[in-house]
């Protein structure tokens, strides 16, 4: 079965508010085997909401509408849904009595406007709200099920778990959604899609989604099936050929970030790592230390933003800086060697470059980045030219450095 979620409230269209309810509902519906195919946010506009409800109920089996059940004039959900379905909206004496008792128990005065919350759509069932004063409603229309839920997350979650899930369990066919998340480093989104599209386009189930971030691509496979074993078989049918095509560019098959994967490899080897950073100003060290237990393998870092610090803390020679510049293969190599020498770490990573928006050296274009790794076997330096703003470039190069470390540990050929 397919579902749609409609979030109501003009405040949800501002940059200050985030619709977290839809994330929760999507996770819960997926557990039932229900696929959420559409989400939208609509302001406090009765006509727009009514139009959306008509479209959603006509095409999806489950429609969940969140918010807009309060007592004020801008709480338009009840009126809009009644309008969309051409049903009456009437004052329900039982709900009104319940509301009056709620206010009395709290020793609060019930304002006249609160009676708006006692209006019920013709044919709807009441969903009690034990955490607020906005009852929900459940109704059926043309074979579809619609739910009206309160906007406050603590009210919505309690109502959905106690009132909606039992009802849905009775009407939703038994189905399972199985997922597989692969994460890839070392290639761009368009190159990756061109390589694997001939595989995944053969299948409607599992569905394949590609999500790209700076230096990191996620491949999401979602299989809808009757049993977990059937779903796993469907996933394997698609994932197998993709894994053969991508090879060691895949660094995670369970959604783990690159810093988590690298941390696991270092722990397994009882190895350590340190960092020496210039352009990234500590971002690489921060990523490594976000992993719980990273003190087992992270020895420390040096932020050597100017040449004086590179010389004093890392022992980079003045001759290298003068002849090649701070942004160069030679400086990156010297930084990694110096950091490893001073910390006695198994591995040392270094980053130097021009992150922008301007470059300190007119000979070095913005986006020029060098990262180096040093270990007992020697050093390796990788140079890349990145596009984007300052933050994006810095994120790209930290991803490149972490992947360089992963490949060094596992003995893969560097292609990042």
Curated annotation (Swiss-Prot):
A Pfam family this chain is assigned to: CinA_KH
CDD domains: cinA
SMART domains linked to this entry: MoCF_biosynth
SUPFAM superfamilies: CinA-like, Molybdenum cofactor biosynthesis proteins
Top-rank taxon, per record: Bacteria
UniProt-listed InterPro entries: CinA (IPR050101), CinA-like_C (IPR036653), CinA_C (IPR008136), CinA_KH (IPR041424), Competence-induced_CinA (IPR008135), MoaB/Mog-like_dom_sf (IPR036425), MoaB/Mog_dom (IPR001453)
Family to which the UniProt record says this protein belongs: Belongs to the CinA family.
PANTHER family tied to this protein: NICOTINAMIDE-NUCLEOTIDE AMIDOHYDROLASE PNCC, NMN AMIDOHYDROLASE-LIKE PROTEIN YFAY
HAMAP family linked: CinA_B (MF_00226_B)
Name of the protein in its database record: CinA-like protein
Taxonomic path: Bacteria, Pseudomonadati, Acidobacteriota, Terriglobia, Bryobacterales
